[in-house]
Amino acid sequence: MGRYVIRRLLQMIPVFFGTTLLIFLMVNVMGDPIAGLCGERQCDPATAAQLRSEFGLDKPVWQQYLTYMGNVFTGDFGTAFNGQKVTELMATAFPITIRLTIVALLFEIVIGISLGVVTGLRRGRPIDTTVLILTLVVISIPTFVTGLLLQLLLGVKWGIIHPSVSSGAPVNELIIPGLVVASVSLAYVTRLTRTSIAENARADYVRTAVAKGLPRRRVIIRHLLRNSLIPVVTFIGTDVGALMGGAIVTERIFNIHGVGYQLYQGILRQNSQTVVGFVTILVLVFLAANLIVDLLYAVLDPRIRYA
């Protein structure tokens, strides 16, 4: 297991550098960020040259990338064009998005897996058909429609929640936004769990456990559920990074100043330092989540062992 972890960590190095280089190049293709600092009028050539020199934009792209990565390994993610450190923006945005992601994951795990197990064990029955139809409806509706509808009904019309989240973003105010973020993934987790449970319920090892006279609850939890969760864990693991970086629309709807909001502002203002800095952290989150998922395979299924 130890050698496997070391090998995976070594494999992450080229993936990390390749991904960050690609993002860095894509951000530089967006246009001249200095031009956006002067508003509608054109920047004075002397001022523009001074700003490019200050932010290192007068150097070749490959040299900018090497300088940036060297600073990253010292904990310096650069400075936004408004003079604020990117690390300060991260310190404000990431705790909010982490709380939002945890709320969304709880919805996915608790509701999604529970519904998947129930429908998988009752395949073809009315509850199975009902859940399949409901999940298909949820998948078909865009996230921004779900968010705006819940905000209008629960926040504006009925007054159950605040229409917008306060600056501190406490957990109780993130419940509905978390449900909106998790809605589509929750539906996929439900359907994936249902399919996996239904397939493994006919497996030989489950029939053997039943033939031995083991209690039904033990057969489901200890044997059927553990092996059926492998594809679900894979989906949830890859969904962690998507939830943290892909909640731009939901954060805009509920006025949440998290990672999605900062990425939106960075792209809108062509603030390359902010965009690259946040995406660099998200890449690390993706890589760490994938490694944890691989290690969980051996916990869920004893047949899987890493040399």
Predicted regions and their residues:
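A hydrophobic, multi-pass inner-membrane permease signature
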Residues: V138-T146
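N-terminal signal-anchor/signal peptide hydrophobic helix marking the start
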Residues: I6-V15
